[in-house]
Curated annotation (Swiss-Prot):
This is Glyceraldehyde-3-phosphate dehydrogenase 2. SUPFAM superfamilies: Glyceraldehyde-3-phosphate dehydrogenase-like, C-terminal domain, NAD(P)-binding Rossmann-fold domains. It comes from Drosophila subobscura (Fruit fly). Belongs to the glyceraldehyde-3-phosphate dehydrogenase family. It catalyses: D-glyceraldehyde 3-phosphate + phosphate + NAD(+) = (2R)-3-phospho-glyceroyl phosphate + NADH + H(+). Its EC number is 1.2.1.12. InterPro entries: GlycerAld/Erythrose_P_DH, GlycerAld_3-P_DH_AS, GlycerAld_3-P_DH_cat, GlycerAld_3-P_DH_NAD(P)-bd, Glyceraldehyde-3-P_DH_1, NAD(P)-bd_dom_sf. One of its GO terms (cellular component) is cytosol.
C-alpha cells in the first residue's frame, strides 16, 4: 500500500518511475489496486496493463515479481533509487540487497534499527552522499520531529510524553485473532480503541540528538481509515505563554519549515487532513497550557 501511494506521489511531483516489484500480485491486479483507492479516491490519470508493463499516464513501468530483493534487476530498468516499502527489509544488511541488482541508493519507508534516519526539515543536513541506505523514519516521527524541533530550539524541552491517536493500518485484525506476544494488537480494529507501543518518540532522539532520552510515547489505534494526530505534552526549560508558542510554530511553518510543518487555527477534524502533504500540521486551537512551563501541543498528519 505504501508503495502504491509513493507511486502516486512520485507522479504528482514529476519523478520518473521506471520499475516496481511485487511478488504477490500480477500486473492486472496492480492496475486495479492503483486505479481505485478506498481512502484517497480514484487515480486521476490513466493506468493500464500492456505487454507485461504497468503503464501510468502513458509511461511504461517495468514490473518485477521477486520475493528476494537481491534478484531484482533494477539496472535493466534504469532504476537508480529504490523505495523499500515492504516493512520487511528494514536494516542496512537487508535493504542493501537491492544494490546487488544495480540500485545506487535505497530509502527505507520505515524506522530502521541501524540505517541513518532522516526527517525532512529536521536533520537532512546530516546526510552524506556516500550513504547508500537511509531511513525516512515513521509517519509519526515525521509528524512529531518538526514540531519538537521548533519547541526545543525556542523554549528547550526538558522532558515530554507523546501519544499518537492513530488510524487503523494493514497489520491490524478485522476481527479478534492471535497476534504473537502483543495480544491487544490482535483485537478487532473496527470495534476497539487499542493501546499500542510506538517507537516514534524515542526515534526523535536519533534525528534530534539533544532530545535523546527526553521523549517517549505510546499509541492508541482507533477505528478510522486514515489521518492520525500527535499529542505532545512537554515541560519547558524556558517559560512561554501558549500564544508565544503558537507564534514561533507559525513563524517556522511560514519560513524554514514551509511545506513540512503546517499551521491551522480553524475548527478542524481528522478528515480535513486526508491527502494533506505536510509531515505535520499544528492545531493552534486544540492545544492547552497549564502554566508557562507545561504545555500540551496537538499536530495532525495523514499517516499514509
Amino acid at each position: 500500500r505504501i508503495g502504491r501511494l509513493v507511486l502516486r506521489a512520485a507522479i504528482d511531483k514529476g519523478a520518473s518511475v521506471v520499475a516496481v516489484n511485487d511478488p504477490f500480485i500480477d500486473v492486472n491486479y496492480m492496475v486495479y489496486l492503483f486505479k481505485f483507492d478506498s481512502t484517497h479516491g480514484r487515480f486521476k490519470g490513466t493506468v493500464v496493463a500492456e505487454g507485461g508493463f504497468l503503464v501510468v499516464n502513458g509511461q511504461k513501468i517495468t514490473v518485477f515479481s521477486e520475493r528476494d530483493p537481491a534478484n531484482i534487476n533494477w539496472a535493466s530498468a534504469g532504476a537508480e533509487y529504490v523505495v523499500e516499502s515492504t516493512g520487511v527489509f528494514t536494516t542496512i544488511e537487508k535493504a542493501s540487497t537491492h544494490l546487488k541488482g544495480g540500485a545506487k541508493k535505497v530509502v527505507i519507508s520505515a524506522p530502521s534499527a541501524d540505517a541513518p534516519m532522516f526527517v525532512c526539515g529536521v536533520n537532512l543536513d546530516a546526510y552524506k552522499p556516500d550513504m547508500k541506505v537511509v531511513s525516512n523514519a515513521s509517519c509519526t516521527t515525521n509528524c512529531l520531529a518538526p514540531l519538537a524541533k521548533v519547541i526545543n530550539d525556542n523554549f528547550e524541552i526538558v522532558e515530554g510524553l507523546m501519544t499518537t491517536v492513530h488510524a487503523t493500518t494493514a497489520t491490524q485484525k478485522t476481527v479478534d485473532g492471535p497476534s504473537g506476544k502483543l495480544w491487544r494488537d490482535g483485537r478487532g480494529a473496527a470495534q476497539n480503541i487499542i493501546p499500542a507501543a510506538t517507537g516514534a518518540a524515542k526515534a526523535v532522539g536519533k534525528v534530534i540528538p539533544a532530545l535523546n532520552g527526553k521523549l517517549t510515547g505510546m499509541a492508541f489505534r482507533v477505528p478510522t481509515p486514515n489521518v492520525s494526530v500527535v499529542d505532545l505534552t512537554v515541560r519547558l526549560g524556558k517559560g512561554a505563554s501558549y500564544d508565544e508558542i503558537k507564534a514561533k510554530v507559525q513563524e517556522a511553518a511560514n519560513g524554514p519549515l514551509k511545506g513540512i510543518l503546517g499551521y491551522t487555527d480553524e475548527e478542524v477534524v481528522s478528515t480535513d487532513f486526508l491527502s494533506d502533504t505536510h509531515s505535520s500540521v499544528f492545531d493552534a486551537k486544540a492545544g492547552i497550557s497549564l502554566n508557562d512551563k507545561f504545555v500540551k501541543l496537538i499536530s495532525w498528519y495523514d499517516n499514509e
